[in-house]
Structure formats: structure tokens, C-alpha cells
């Protein structure tokens, strides 16, 4: 068993098995009694929404059935106007899926705070958690980023690697689950790029990611 922990990144489209692979890495770390930190580039978006909805941060089980259903189901949002009509004083509502709320919030705040706002948020959160560990735990700790969706997120994990002195391994996920989906949202383009290169489920794409970031791919 290698004592020094690593940094793992997972890339794949919707429903490609990223959560399953992250869970497998968690189980493996637990079997080796190795500490683990989960880095989630969507966590800052979720906490922003939870603060808007409830007034405080709320821990969400992202592997649970409730969260999966919330992303798929639509909610009614009351508006002080009627969409697509010039009637500003009429109350109306719009239906929005949980996944759409996450995507729209993430993209809009990027326009305000920079394209890498969530990458910076997550890298800081992970590095701060790692820095609070004992020297032994920090050395052995694995860090898992369950979903890389943008160049800036990949750049962020290499920055975390510099701060922690850990090796990076990035794997491609392409398991075709019942929820497997190819769509044109900007957050899916990163994974689709590697799909277009012919990458298969389980491939180590670390060097391909580096080449993409260096502009060589």
C-alpha cells in the first residue's frame, strides 16, 4: 500500500458513473484507513442556493435519492411579472428544475465574479480542510474531485496538488446509466471534448487534460 495520498479527478457527462467511481474511491480509502477529502465544484453553488432558500448553509447528501429527484423535478417560483409579456404588475410563476437552478446560478455568478469563481471557492475549501489535518493524516489523505466540468476546475486541482505535494490522476467515466445524457449545456463541453477523442470508461486522461490546458490538444 502506498502511504502517500493522491488527488483524483473524474470527468464524464451526465449519468456516466462519476458518483459511482467517487464512491468506489471512498470505499477504497476507508478499507486502507486513509483519510479523504471530497472536492465538489458544485458545492459553492448549492450553498448559495440553500442560503437563498433557507437563510443558512445546509449540508446536502449528494449521493442520496432525494437530491437526485430534486435535480430532476420542477418547482414553481413566484415572479412579480408575467414572463414574456408586458404586464409588470401581474404575479405569475415559472417552473424550474433543480438542475436548471444549479446551472443558471453557477453561470450567472461566474459573470459577476469571474469564470473561475467556483473553482477558486472549492480549491480554497479543500486546501483549508487539508491544512487543518495532522501531519500524518495530511500525508496519507486522498483528495477526490467528483466532477471536472471546466478547464479552470482542472487547473484548480493542479494548484491544490502544488499546495499539498500530491500526485494528480484524472479518470474518464463513460458508463451508460439510465440517466446518461448528452446535452449542449456549457458545463458538459469539457467531458464531451474527451468523448470526441475516443476516451473510454476508466481511461486515465491525466496527460490529455494537461495537454488541453497547455493548448497542445
Provide a role label for each language-model segment:
Residues 1-9:
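Extreme N-terminal, non-catalytic leader segments
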Residues 13:
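P-loop (Walker A) phosphate-binding loop of NTP-binding proteins
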Residues 16:
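ATP-binding Walker
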Residues 19:
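Walker A/P-loop
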Residues 27-38:
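Post-Walker A helix-loop "phosphate-sensing" segment adjacent to the P-loop in P-loop NTPases
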Residues 43-143:
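ATP-dependent small-molecule kinase phosphotransfer cores
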Residues 101-104, 121-189:
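ATP-dependent NMP and nucleoside kinases share a basic, alpha-helical "lid"
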